[in-house]
């Protein structure tokens, strides 16, 4: 890793711990009819089983005053998350139209240390902010073995906040976001039991 100064340096950090574990369920609310789409409700829970980023210290790399590296790497975000959404699917031969809308709620959590400064440690609460997502697309068969799909998804994330012990909430600048993803995919059925899927986004 190089900086703006003539000094170069590098630092290796790795973590093979487990990440956050999640589980979900899907339930068909309404089956597809000639005039209405198939509607599926989903709910998912994510547990903070991974290493959370709060309290990980950043230290100056030896012989390079412009480079700091973390003592450890996070494998999760440290909070419980509950998400839910609806998926709509409608067949219009030879195409299939689909759309989805979702919401994810991150629960506020208190940590014994939320500082990244090795010279300081202080507890506090973290609120990662909630997010909304919507998307849609279509898939259609090119022949009996090959199909193509196109989709677009957009995600809106609210600002994250931190609250040091004894102080008021502070928003983290730049933590809110609005991001979109456009995807193209092709599926080819090589056999009755094996398919090859390619995706570009």
Where are these regions (language model features)?
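Outer membrane beta-barrel transmembrane domains
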Residues: 110-201
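Transmembrane beta-strands of outer-membrane beta-barrel pores
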Residues: 20, 29, 45-51, 90-94, ...
């Amino acid at each position: 890793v190089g900086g703006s100064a003539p000094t170069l340096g590098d630092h290796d950090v790795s973590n093979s711990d487990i990440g956050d574990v999640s589980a979900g369920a899907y339930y068909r609310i309404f089956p597809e009819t000639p005039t209405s789409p198939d509607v599926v409700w989903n709910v998912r829970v994510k547990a903070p089983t991974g290493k959370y980023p709060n309290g990980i210290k950043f230290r100056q790399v030896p012989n390079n005053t412009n480079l700091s590296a973390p003592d450890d790497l996070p494998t999760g975000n440290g909070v419980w998350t509950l998400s839910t959404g609806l998926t709509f699917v409608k067949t219009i031969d030879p195409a299939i139209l689909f759309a989805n809308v979702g919401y994810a709620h991150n629960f506020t959590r208190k940590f014994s240390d939320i500082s990244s400064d090795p010279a300081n440690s202080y507890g506090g609460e973290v609120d990662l902010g909630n997010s909304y997502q919507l998307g849609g697309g279509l898939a259609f068969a090119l022949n009996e073995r090959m199909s193509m799909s196109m989709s677009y998804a957009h995600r809106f994330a609210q600002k994250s906040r931190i609250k040091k012990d004894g102080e008021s909430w502070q928003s983290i600048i730049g933590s809110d976001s609005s991001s979109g993803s456009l995807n193209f995919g092709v599926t080819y059925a090589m056999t009755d039991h094996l398919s090859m899927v390619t995706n570009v986004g």
